[in-house]
Amino acid sequence: MTGFELYLKANTRAFDRYLSTFFTDGTHPDMGRYLYGPLKQFSDNSGKRHRPLICLLACEAVGGDPKQAWPAAAAVEHFHTAALVHDDIEDSSLTRRDEPCMHIAEGLGIAINAGDLALALVCGTVVHDPGLDDPTKIRVLAELVDMTTRTIEGQALDIGWARDGRFDLTVDDYLTMANHKTAFYSGGVPLAIGAIIGGGSTAQVETLRAFGMAAGLAFQIQDDVLNLVGTRESTKKDFRSDIAEGKRTLVAIHALQHADRRERLLEILSTHSDDPVLLDEAVEIMQAADSIAFARDYAHDLIVEAKACLVDAVPASRARDLLASMADFFVKRSS
């Protein structure tokens, strides 16, 4: 295990306990059944908690007390939960991490409503944080609002291109979409918020943000790669669903620009079939065009860029070492 993985393992359980305090039964017993219970169950199964935990690391890296950043870190995780609930609906996904998606298990209406509550918790958690002064709250809230807006903009590109059957896209188009959809909330903003709460300088906040944006984009590219070449068991997601859904990933866009069998790949991506034979054929075309290798190399270069930012941002410390380990983990993980 990397240092960052050990850090996640050591801290996830305590953070999970803290998150559970947000999922009460509300003002009526049935709210637990129809709202807070489903949301808690989904949140409990929503991943490694790297987003909130890197927020704490950023706070520590600039000399702050990471305990002060717990509510803001929880706000980031609430957003992640909301984004996943709504994303599963928009993508018509069936499972997430070996469990039925909320809209499958509880129904579409319950899932939309629970996702909306998670969004409300994002700002509410910070507003009601007794440990932050008002100027800091305003800065953190501004970051969260911008993060939410950018992520929704990225999702609009992703689902809009799919709806309109758009494959006339460039690598730069993909990078814009992925930066908005993933990098802001998976790296850039959690780190900026942690640095703000920790009392970091403007230069530290912005350099940690840049580190997080590069690492967050690499995280998304690695997700794209794992969806194609991992295994259903290791990814714990809908394996090769990106092909079945005709997703405009970096791999797909590169292959459509360079593959000898471009028209055949375009045909497969446009059929929205989950036939394993067709999925295998699409991956073979992508591999022959060196598109998967291109994506891996691009993600690796982003991590080199990210780690260079980190050295400039904060002095040597345990927290800085763990953030560097995080960047490596983002592109070496298998799920």
Residue ranges and their predicted role:
Residues G3-Y7, F42, I110, Y174-N179, ...:
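Non-transmembrane, amphipathic alpha-helical segments
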